[in-house]
Amino acid sequence: METMITREDDSPRVAEMVRQCNFGEIQSYGPISVIPVLGEGKASGPEYVSLSEALEDGLIEVTEVSEGGDVPYLNVKNLSARKVLLLDGEELMGAKQNRVLNTTVLVSEEDELTIPVSCTERGRWRYKGKTFEDSNLIMAKKTQYLKSSSVSKSLCVNESYDSDQGGVWNSIDAMHAKYGSGSHTAAMKHVYDQQGDLLSAYVEKFPCVEKQRGVVVFVDGELAGCEMISRNQPYLRCHEKIIKSFCIDLLHRKIEKEEKTGSLDKAKDWLDSIEKWKSERFKSLGIGDDLRLKNGVSHGNALLADETIVHFVGFGPQVLEN
């Protein structure tokens, strides 16, 4: 891997991506408020399809790296003439155990990569099939924040995309304990499955709107995070996953008639502040560069390719309070 590069223009580049977008009407349900981020005009940068679409159409194949497998790594083979975007935190299910992506990767046409992952099912190490499928989930944002922060530390210390696997397992265990969910393999997916009705209620309140490319999310009126993708169609395929990842930690909360909501001014202030965050750049395992951004307890990472921010996920202070 190439040496870390500190670039003063990377944080402003992410902030500029947001400034080029418009915002939709605020949507609120329970303690959560969502502001849709809308892309205007033709998208710039590389064209690609989402992981969900690629797996559905047989464009890529994801397997263990060998017959025996290796927990922190998977093999991705792009069988198509289209680029494929895999998002930080997206879960793949099957093979010897379920895993999530440790960082966002844009896989080139007809390319084959070894990608870094974290285990989200520590009670299973046996085959359910040779290939992985889309679990239709992104890990809970609090867990993703902790994982992403540990990956950023690994990049700075030894230039690897390794996560704190023990921390990921502990966070998943805490989710099971919170909801009293049962799972003989300690699978993260089982929490989502067993809370399906409550999650669906939130998803229905936060529909994807025309031209949407992202969300800014508030909890109890305070900013919890933001996620954006550079193209509308891939975002549409990921929207429900993203909404669930913000909501899963809050299903124990009662729905009150009067809840604090977010505001467009608060969203713009936080997004504008990204311009001044500390940023570090690393060579991505796929196309482009992996950007790591931090400002106090706020943290984010982005994929830069063809001078375009293809994906950005940012975590605000409130994500840790959930």
Feature-to-residue mapping (PLM):
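Long, low-complexity, serine/threonine/proline-rich intrinsically disordered regulatory regions
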Residues: 2-17, 25, 151-322
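Edge strands and adjacent loops of beta-rich recognition modules
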Residues: 36-61
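Short, surface-exposed beta-strand-loop junctions and turns on beta-sheet-rich folds
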Residues: 82-83, 92-94, 232-233
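Glycine-centered loop/turn motifs
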Residues: 71, 87-90
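Asparagine-centered strand-capping/turn motif at beta-strand->loop junctions
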Residues: 73-84
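Short, solvent-exposed loop/turn segments enriched in Ser/Thr/Gly
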Residues: 67-73
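Short, low-hydrophobicity acidic/polar segments
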Residues: 126-155
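Intrinsically disordered, low-complexity Pro/Gly/Ser/Thr-rich segments with frequent PxxP/GP/PP motifs
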Residues: 3, 8-33, 38-39, 91, ...
